[in-house]
């Protein structure tokens, strides 16, 4: 989002568009009774990995416990992966300008020269508000996310520190 300014913007109730240097990240959280709330990680871009994970866990737990945050997240991440859903078409709820759906991890055959190889994959679906971002900008943003996920590694020491 730091490299893609349109995804740091918010659409205010009066339809003004504002851009923030630091940005919040929304996480859709399923609640009892088929309800949904958004956990908000405030200034997500300023946190290192251990801080982000700690804040994520605390924020999601608080949201499940009934806390409602002011929703100022330009992008909300949602997933039905826990239910085995591979793909979805989320909607964008203002003030957000984008919603990223992350599907469940599953195996697919990937062509590799003369043979196919099995690989674990996920499906990403990005829905965005055309008043703020165009298709080419959204494609560039989605491609950046894809590349970051493909290259993502958590050092064992950091993972162990987060668990304790």
Residue ranges and their predicted role:
Residues 2-164:
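C-terminal catalytic/motor cores of large multi-domain enzyme assemblies
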């Amino acid at each position: 989002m730091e490299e893609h300014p349109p995804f740091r913007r918010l659409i205010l109730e009066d339809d003004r568009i504002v851009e923030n240097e630091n940005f919040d990240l929304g996480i859709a959280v399923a609640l009892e009774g088929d309800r949904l709330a958004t956990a908000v990680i405030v200034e997500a871009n300023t946190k290192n990995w251990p801080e982000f994970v700690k804040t994520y866990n605390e924020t999601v737990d608080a949201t499940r416990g009934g806390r409602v945050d002011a929703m100022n997240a330009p992008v909300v991440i949602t997933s039905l992966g826990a239910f085995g859903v591979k793909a979805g078409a989320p909607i964008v709820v203002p003030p957000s300008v984008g919603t990223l759906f992350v599907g469940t991890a599953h195996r697919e055959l990937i062509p590799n020269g003369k043979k196919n190889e099995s690989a674990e994959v996920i499906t990403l679906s990005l829905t965005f508000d055309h008043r703020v971002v165009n298709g080419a900008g959204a494609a560039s943003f989605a491609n950046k996310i894809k590349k970051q996920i493909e290259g993502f590694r958590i050092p064992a020491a950091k993972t162990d520190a987060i668990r304790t």
